[in-house]
Design a protein with these regions (language model features):
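Structural signal for hydrophobic packing residues in well-ordered secondary-structure cores
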Residues: 35, 39, 54-61, 65, ...
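Residue-level signal for inorganic ion chemistry
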Residues: 10, 46, 68, 90, ...
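Short acidic active-site motifs
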Residues: 23, 189-190, 380
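Terminal low-complexity tails and localization/encapsulation signals of metabolic enzymes
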Residues: 1-16, 48, 52, 84, ...
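Glycine-rich loop-to-alpha-helix module at the N-terminal edge of alpha/beta enzyme cores
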Residues: 4, 8-100, 111
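Rossmann-like NAD(P) dinucleotide-binding subdomain of oxidoreductase/dehydrogenase enzymes
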Residues: 102-246, 375
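ALDH superfamily catalytic-core signature
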Residues: 202, 210-355, 377-379, 383-384
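Short, well-ordered beta-strand elements within core beta-sheets of diverse protein domains
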Residues: 13-19, 33-40, 126, 236-239, ...
Length: 393
């Protein structure tokens, strides 16, 4: 597998093995063996390892942020925040090692004592996306490890270098062999093998709704515990009495932060008709000043799309928007001029005259595209906001 810089596709960041079923078998066997002893380590002692991970992450924060920016493309300010979330998660999870409380409950019988005790589940497969390559693996792995589980991380192939560096930091913290494992590969091979493996007890997945549906159905058939975080079509409502400057800040960051490549991105702006024209002008002016560029360029506001496939997906939705009758106020095209010629860049885009039934108002685009929908009342705005096929709001 090749990991390339999305701001300059000619640059190979790293190469990694394309793990197959036998590699997954090896990782699961390693995690299963380690689980037998790791689960007996007292929770406060397990938490000390995770606290050390947080300390090492703090020492390597800038190095990791630079790697995220180079491999995934997000601006350095965002990349530093990505690492900081991992650091915060480490220290929080470590604190929970002394708070894994159970419960005592009254018994109907005088010679009985009733209580609950938290017990680890077993081997956990963690399948993570590329948009938060440090934060999301940390969210998943750290609580699981403190609770006495062992884990296998299968990151998105676009951010293999970030995942490798993160696992090296876990190793530096002294975790016993087999407690945390890394499997590179594509979803249809390594990911599928993990989800279907009989010795995996829990699957935690963050990614597309289509893949998540497969993961959920498979875990249902095999009686695995499962946690799914999938797509969203999130909206921001701006009413006639809103603080428009405050709303504008939220709209620009929500729509174009991380190049719109977040399941929580603001892809719909629901605007009251009394302020729509004024707010649209404000949004246009702010959007026109946003600068495209490589993530490690300090002048960059919006980085590249992750890869060619996703770039073409965003472009396809702009064709759909035009066919459905939406008006492109700004952007709407692949950007390839000058220093952007070797990257996967898409212009920040505002779509006007969007109605709630259009595909661009209902389907996740995962790019720097925001759709404007006009309403005449708060009740209408709420109804449109809630009319979504996705679980995230």
């Amino acid at each position: 597998l090749e990991s390339r810089n999305p701001a300059d596709k000619t640059e190979i960041v790293a190469t990694y093995p394309r793990s197959q079923v036998n590699d997954v078998d090896t990782a699961v066997a390693s995690a299963r063996k380690a689980y037998r002893s790791w689960r007996t380590v007292p929770a406060p002692a397990r938490a000390e390892y995770i606290f050390r991970v947080g300390e090492i992450l703090l020492q390597h924060k800038e190095e990791l942020a630079q790697l995220i920016s180079r491999e995934m493309g997000k601006p350095l300010t965002e990349a530093r925040g990505d690492v900081q979330e991992g650091i915060d998660c480490a220290f929080y999870s470590a604190g929970e090692g002394r708070r894994l409380f159970g419960q005592t409950t009254p018994s109907e019988m005088s010679n009985k004592f009733a209580m609950t005790v938290r017990m680890p589940i077993g081997v956990c497969a963690l399948i993570t996306p590329w948009n938060f390559p440090v934060a999301i693996p940390c969210w998943k792995a750290m609580p699981a490890l403190v609770c006495g589980n062992t884990v296998i991380l299968k990151p998105a192939e676009d951010t293999s270098a970030c995942a490798t560096k993160l696992i090296e930091i876990f190793q530096q913290a002294g975790l016993p062999p087999g407690v945390i494992n890394l499997v590179h590969g594509v979803g249809e091979e390594a990911g599928k093998a993990l989800v279907e493996h009989p010795n995996v007890d829990l699957v935690s997945f963050t990614g597309s709704s289509e893949t998540g549906a497969f993961v959920g159905a498979t875990c249902g058939r095999t009686h695995k515990r499962v946690c799914l975080e999938m797509g969203g079509k999130n909206a921001q409502i701006v009413m006639e009495d809103a603080d428009l400057e405050l709303a504008l800040d939220g709209a620009v960051w929500g729509a174009f932060g991380t190049t719109g490549q977040r399941c929580t991105a603001t892809s719909r702006l629901i605007l009251h008709r009394d302020i729509k024209e004024k707010f649209t002008t404000m949004l246009y002016e702010r959007t026109s000043k946003l600068r495209l560029g490589a993530g490690n360029d300090t002048d960059t506001d919006i980085g590249p799309i992750i890869n060619e496939k996703q770039l073409q997906q965003v472009s396809k939705y702009l064709d759909i928007a035009r066919e459905e009758g939406a008006k492109v106020l700004i952007g709407g095209e692949i950007a390839s001029e000058g220093s952007l010629k070797n990257g996967y860049f898409f212009q920040p885009t505002i779509l006007d005259r969007v109605t709630p039934d259009m595909r661009v108002a209902r389907e996740e685009i995962f790019g720097p595209v925001v759709a404007l929908i006009e309403v005449s009342s708060f009740e209408e705005a709420i109804a449109i906001l809630n009319d979504s096929n996705y679980g995230l709001s």
